[in-house]
């Protein structure tokens, strides 16, 4: 580990812990104020709507059901299942989004004609198309969890397409003309110039798409009647929210941590693969 990195890591860890501590304090302060003064705006504050954070942490180490494994054990297994679906969905969305961007980058006519439909695809609620995808793929004998991956890909391909297209079009026009003057083919220009130039833009999209893959998988699991993932756990604990709200909150925390984990993997991959990023990358 280099010396600058060795200095940055402890600072970032301390910053994360400090921010977490501040948020914890704000939560508990608002809980105390809300219960003490019986606040009803923006919502009624009580132990159901805002359970103490220490109760949420304690719930992770208590049995999820009588004589069963701990809630943390159950949620970790559910996280692995959802992570499998989301990882495949992310890969499908990334490959599909980049492929669409490559096609559109070769023709302004195609770009102007297809981009509006790409944008319009994101206005359709995932819950509306999830049953159609699950039933349609199920009729072909495809496993339900693969249908969930397809739905996760549906959420992830859009940012990849838009950013990849921007990256492919950001190649220096002078470099493109120089390669053409040496009779370079479109394929050579694409893979030797445009694709490397688009990497920073791609990873900007991947940082957005990775957590979206988790969201897509979790939302789609109930439509596929999958009980083994985080989506199934959320639906299950939602039925007992008025009695044990901390279980649902704990599930939400684990879901958020899984999304953060996917994001950090992308950040690590970016640091390993992208050496220099253009300053104007969003």
Where are these regions (language model features)?
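N-terminal signal-anchor/first transmembrane alpha helix
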Residues: 1-34
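Short hydrophobic, aromatic-rich alpha-helical segments embedded in or entering the lipid bilayer
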Residues: 48-61, 224-239
